[in-house]
Amino acid sequence: MKSVITISASLAISLMLCCTAQANDHKILGVIAMPRNETNDLALKLPVCRIVKRIQLSTDHGDLQLSGASVYFKATRSASQTLNIPSEIKEGQTTDWININSDNDNKRCVSKITFSGHTVNSSDMATLKIIGDD
């Protein structure tokens, strides 16, 4: 009897943890190494086109200076959206959520995200991590 109760409790806890993990749909979409010189063609291509409603940016190994970002959607006319991003991200910092797909058409999927910017205050290249929420 005691083992039945233990197994039941374990299953219940596992089910709660499972459902909690599914509720958080945040995924690392990719990481870009940012060069030390200003570059305007840094692209994160998503191998599988996915619906992404918002993104967060974070950095490691140095500070970043960003001058622009755009999202490209898989569509017949290659639609895109310019993102409103912070101009600087310090090492270890994560931005607030940046909304995308805000044009009443939440069915479009993201095929690529491009960035313009460079590493500052570091001899190593900083890494820009892109986190998506669908």
Swiss-Prot record:
Keywords from the UniProt entry: Signal
Pfam families linked to this entry: DUF2541
Family that this chain belongs to: Belongs to the UPF0412 family.
Protein name from the UniProt record: UPF0412 protein YaaI
Signal peptide: 1-23
HAMAP family: UPF0412 (MF_01372)
Superkingdom assignment: Bacteria
